[in-house]
Design a protein with these regions (language model features):
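Short, motif-level signal for alpha-helix interfacial/capping segments enriched in acidic residues
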Residues: 8-9, 199, 347-349
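Extreme N-terminus of proteins, especially the signal/transit-peptide cleavage junction
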Residues: 14-19, 288-289
């Protein structure tokens, strides 16, 4: 009888008390391995502080998962110097369980992605991106399973289905994430289902609605800082911001028990060995990028929160440099998402600043487009969240029937970022000079930046 009671007690214990798992979550680091100034606060974030915090949690908890929702490499000077090689080589120190593929992982094609995955020694996930390359076919998995005290956690990675509209999608095929998740959950035995997503909140909501058995969606792509989880039915969704500013903490037993987060604030301790590695990288960057190109007597507004919703003088500086590609232009425009310095600038402007201002390698092109379609482009650009258009048009009023010569970047000229009205235009010229070089030339010519010099009427 005693033996029977003991067996029943064990069974009841197993049913009622699932093991607690601590899930740590990050997203949209965009190559910020050193601390940055964020919203006016210096020394925020940084890979080294993140590492120390993660290891503290691991030391205090038996079961820990460390997951990232993608866009890990591209977007800073650290990426520009070697396409992410040095960023990737830091990843083995922190030991992520998995990172979802974000759209910016593809900005320089699958060859660069392959090298970064090899150097990172980290498992990357995407169930709905399919590769032609043999190495990437094997290296990027659709899912992983992590077992804690007999409970199987199925973690499926998904990437935005709009990938073709956002990045270089040569040599890959992108399928519907909902379809791919459904295929996997029919085939794999699991107890808990986590979606590691770089789809964006709207698509995550669709996934949650379509598959209500999901236990948790860890999201990214929008750069949102959630204060609490959002729920679609019983499915919790969370995002943990950008640039390594914070780490999300989710306690999980049978269900999500709690969600909080830790901001990587200036006073947090960093790891001495990692600090040495990053200092070595910084020394290399300083050596090759410290040349002063100009001095700004005005504050150039580059913080993302302002750029997302307004035209700024830094945007005007970038447009001024683009205009030098084709002097016969009628209009010049670029999406604010192409400008990523995320801080205001004053005083000496260096080569390093240029690489942060323009981290992407898009060509400068001239598009011939009818006035009515140009109006549609401008209208769209003023409705965008996080992608507000920086632009200048010579005509005070656009003639719907006139054909305009418009300078822009190849990214939105291809209709990406929702600028599909460019399909009515035609690319007639491509500048042989990259945008960073045009900006460097412009800064050297200006020497001193003033409001007057940023007035297009004075060019």
């Amino acid at each position: 009888m005693k033996k029977l009671i003991l067996i029943l007690a064990l069974l009841i214990g197993n049913i009622c008390f699932a093991s607690e798992v601590m899930i740590l979550h990050t997203s949209d680091t965009h190559g910020r391995i050193s601390p940055i100034e964020y919203n006016g606060v210096k020394n925020m974030g940084g890979f080294s502080k993140r590492l120390v915090f993660v290891n503290e949690i691991r030391n205090k908890n038996k079961n820990v998962l460390l997951l990232d929702s993608g866009d890990y490499f591209q977007g800073s000077i650290y990426y520009r110097i070697d396409y992410g090689k040095r960023i990737a080589k830091l990843l083995p120190d922190i030991k992520y369980d998995a990172i979802a593929l974000g759209n910016h992982e593809f900005d320089n094609g699958t060859k660069v992605l392959k090298h970064n995955i090899k150097n990172s020694k980290t498992q990357f996930l995407s169930a709905n991106v399919h590769f032609k390359d043999r190495y990437l076919k094997n290296a990027v998995k659709p899912y992983i399973i992590k077992e804690f005290d007999g409970e199987r956690f199925l973690i499926i990675g998904v990437t935005t289905s709009s990938l073709a509209n956002l990045s270089d999608t040569n040599n890959i095929t992108v399928t519907n994430p909902i379809d791919e998740i459904n295929k996997i959950i029919k085939q794999v035995k699991y107890d808990r289902l986590i979606i590691l997503s770089h789809c964006g909140l709207d698509e995550d909501r669709q996934i949650a609605k379509a598959i209500p058995s999901i236990d948790l969606i860890l999201g990214g792509h929008n750069h949102y800082f959630f204060q609490t989880t959002e729920r679609v039915g019983n499915v919790p969704i969370v995002q943990d911001g950008e640039f390594g500013i914070r780490v999300g903490e989710l306690k999980f037993d049978k269900n999500l028990k709690s969600y909080t987060y830790k901001n990587m604030t200036p006073e947090l301790i960093s790891d001495a060995n990692v600090d040495k590695k990053i200092e070595k990288i910084n020394h290399h960057i300083k050596k090759v990028t410290s040349e002063v190109l100009a001095n700004s007597q005005i504050v150039l507004i580059g913080n993302q929160s302002t750029l997302e919703h307004n035209q700024t003088n830094l945007g005007k500086l970038v447009l001024t440099s683009m205009a030098k590609a084709f002097p016969e232009y009628d209009a010049v425009l670029t999406n604010s998402g192409s400008i990523r310095v995320n801080r205001n600038l004053k005083g000496n402007i260096t080569y390093a600043d240029v690489l942060e201002i323009l981290p992407f390698d898009n060509d400068i092109v001239m598009v011939e487009i009818q006035g009515k379609h140009l109006n549609e482009v401008l209208f769209h650009g003023q409705q965008q969240n996080r992608r507000y258009l920086q632009y200048y048009v010579k005509d005070k009023k656009i003639d719907n029937n006139k054909v305009y010569k418009v300078i822009t970047n190849s990214y939105i000229a291809q209709g990406k970022d929702g600028y599909d009205n460019f399909k009515y235009g035609k690319v007639v010229k491509k500048s042989p000079v990259p945008p960073t070089k045009l900006l460097i030339q412009t800064l050297k010519e200006m020497q001193v930046i003033t409001d007057k010099k940023l007035n297009f009427e004075n060019l």
